[in-house]
Amino acid sequence: MCEYCLIHEEDTFFGLEVDHIIAEKHGGETKLENLCCACLTCNRYKGSDIATLDKETRALVRLFDPRFDVWAAHFELEGASIVGKTKVGEATVRLLKLNLEERLLERGILQSLGRYQGNQE
């Protein structure tokens, strides 16, 4: 399962990729504690980013870290939308474009088929 948007590998055309949570160019190592599974779309939008600017304050906000953060503490599912509950969640939703129209459509279809429930924690 993608550790950012929670889509299952079997429901993606391209499967999952291994993402360096902290990119090597930022000093991240290729160790299990710095690697996670990501769908192609999340991984492409995240790229080597580890933070982004807050939309309102322009302060630097780190991105969600699947190894140290709990998904349900930073995000919630409202229909097919993934909503950030914290600054980290909001920044991650925005940077990874988790609520693009086509992503909402995909999650909505999967929900109607009982194949996407988000995080059940």
Question: Which sequence ranges carry the predicted segments?
Answer:
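Short, charged surface segments at domain edges that flank catalytic/cofactor-binding sites
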Residues: 1, 26-29
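Short cysteine-rich loop/turn motifs with clustered Cys
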Residues: 1-16, 36-46
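Extended charged
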Residues: 8-10, 29, 33, 44-121
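Short Cys/His-rich Zn2+-coordinating modules
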Residues: 17-26
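Hydrophobic alpha-helical segments
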Residues: 20, 33-34
